[in-house]
Amino acid sequence: MPEKNRTYRARIEGYTSEGLGVARIDGQAVFVHRALRGEDCDVLILKVLKNAAFGKVVQVHEPSPYRREPDCPWYGRCGGCDFRHMDREEELYAKRQRVQDALHRIGGSDVSVEAIYSGEPLHYRNKSQYPVSADGQVGFYKARSHQLVPVERCLLQKPPADAAADALRRYIETYRVPGYDEKTRRGLLRHLYIRTNQAGQSLICVLVNGKKLPHEPEMVSLLRQAVPETVGVVLGVNTQPTGAILGGEYRTLWGEDVLTDRLCGLTFRLSVPSFYQVNHDMAEVLYRTALDFAGLTGTETVLDLYCGAGTITQVMARRAGRVIGAEIVPAAIEDARENARRNGIGNVEFFCGDASAVAADFAARGLRPDVICVDPPRKGLSPDVVSAAARMQPQRIVYVSCDPATLARDVKLFAQEGYGAVRAAAVDMFPGTANIESVVRLERTK
């Protein structure tokens, strides 16, 4: 077993799900920060656990051909990116392997990840969320902490996001507005939230620990000057003592409280709390892949759980006979219904409720969809949702996931219910980070 504070020479064999290099030292797995596959290096052990250890590279004897100089001055301090020290080819390899390993090791499935789709790696995020620290700094958190790093320019965000962050900094400095302190639960400013559509228009929301801010008109003016294509500025009230960003009530300070975007040839109205994929171009690839995996011919009934603002629902509605969407966020369901009306899609229905309760209710009422599509949050599906979905006896289940581990766990649960994975693909929705989207098609095996 490796000892803490000792240095060992080791070769990196692969990657963890977070992008750490993996080596074996004295028979134990060691996870090495910013080490690349194939590298021969000296590793300083920082922490030793029962079944693994953590370390960092102190010298590279044989560098990987995939190593590159990070292109961001904040890399290593800001927790936003994980892979800026490796080239794109190796990043895509690591991500595809992450999905493949999870499906095999956790899910017990022999399905192969048939492709990994990728696109533009810079300035792709259409939604940005900047926390504000107690001392009024605006930036992003250090990895696995709530320690704020005052990042001024980010390679992942679109230009309006950086401009809005600069404007908020000027507002804080000019009017001495206190940031929120998570320990004392005092202070006002919690987060800056901005969403930008394909036309370059932005909706800005400032999240506060209270009902109002001092000098609101002046703040709005600063934000509009910095981001001229702003369609609206909204104040979000969040007085909950949790790490949640959104929640509570919203008050429009100026302009509109929604943003409209085009995706897959459809128009979508988006309120602040509506779920919407952050990478527009790769979202289109993701939804086309899900549509392909659904195998629709025009007559099927589809149940879309976790439908958000109805994006996948309406994409599938153009190829199905009837589509039912369910989502727990009321504002998202309102957006979904309005989006269907705007797009002239009449073969969709939307229900607001928890996925477990909605799925159980549909199963009890005898709904028999041909296809069920699920796109859950990172925690995946509850066993109740898996069980209810299986009771409806669909021919196919399309699982869209943002976490390979919970996807694989649920694939194993579905196998116990008689559904096996037959196709899988990965979509690089978040270049530069360890996050990866994936799509799996499951079919009845018994």
What does each model-found stretch correspond to?
Residues 2-8, 17, 211-446:
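Rossmann-like S-adenosyl-L-methionine
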Residues 194, 200-209, 267-271:
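Short, aliphatic-rich beta-strand segments
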Residues 114-121, 182-183, 189-191, 426-429:
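Short, solvent-exposed loop/turn elements at beta->coil junctions and helix N-caps
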Residues 21-26, 139-142, 207, 336:
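Short, acidic/hydrophobic/Gly-rich beta-strand patch recurrent on exposed beta strands
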Residues 1-74, 349-350, 357:
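Terminal RNA-binding accessory module
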Residues 42-44, 129, 303:
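Hydrophobic beta-strand signal
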Residues 58-70, 76-179, 199, 213:
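Extended interfacial segments that mediate partner engagement and assembly in macromolecular machines
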Residues 38, 157, 279:
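Short, conserved phosphate/pyrophosphate- and ester-handling motifs at nucleotide-, phospho-/glycolipid
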